Swiss-Prot record:
A zinc finger (unnamed) spans 47-83. This is Protein E7. Plays a role in viral genome replication by driving entry of quiescent cells into the cell cycle. Stimulation of progression from G1 to S phase allows the virus to efficiently use the cellular DNA replicating machinery to achieve viral genome replication. E7 protein has both transforming and trans-activating activities. Induces the disassembly of the E2F1 transcription factor from RB1, with subsequent transcriptional activation of E2F1-regulated S-phase genes. Interferes with host histone deacetylation mediated by HDAC1 and HDAC2, leading to transcription activation. Residues 1-37 are annotated as: E7 terminal domain. A motif (Nuclear export signal) lies at residues 65-73. One of its GO terms (cellular component) is host cell nucleus. InterPro entries: Papilloma_E7. The E7 terminal domain is an intrinsically disordered domain, whose flexibility and conformational transitions confer target adaptability to the oncoprotein. It allows adaptation to a variety of protein targets and exposes the PEST degradation sequence that regulates its turnover in the cell.
Length: 98
């Protein structure tokens, strides 16, 4: 500050002195990475036991939906609510694990 009375110009001069001399407004561009955002997908499959049509809605990435597709083609099977209830209710509770 210069003198007894503080002016806006004095404060601005002090700020200029404390600011780093590095030019932060350079023309360098940073590459942005593409992020695979989750998307909604509708899946139609059939029940493993009774072949009733099942419809699922999931939200996942493109990679996630490909992984699910591979599981459904390989060795993952879905059950409808009725078949699931029948399978799990007819088992003893201690056998409901792996």
């Amino acid at each position: 500050m210069k003198g007894q009375n503080v002016t806006l110009q004095d404060i601005a001069i002090e700020l200029e002195d404390t600011i780093s001399p590095i030019n932060l407004h350079c023309e360098e561009e940073i590459e942005t990475e593409e992020v695979d955002t989750p998307n909604p997908f509708a899946i139609t499959a059939t029940c493993y036991a009774c072949e009733q049509v099942l419809r699922l809605a999931v939200v996942t990435s493109t990679e996630g939906i490909h992984q699910l597709q591979q599981l459904l083609f390989d060795n993952l099977f879905l059950l409808c609510a009725a078949c699931s209830k029948q399978v799990f209710c007819n088992r003893r509770p201690e056998r409901n694990g792996p």
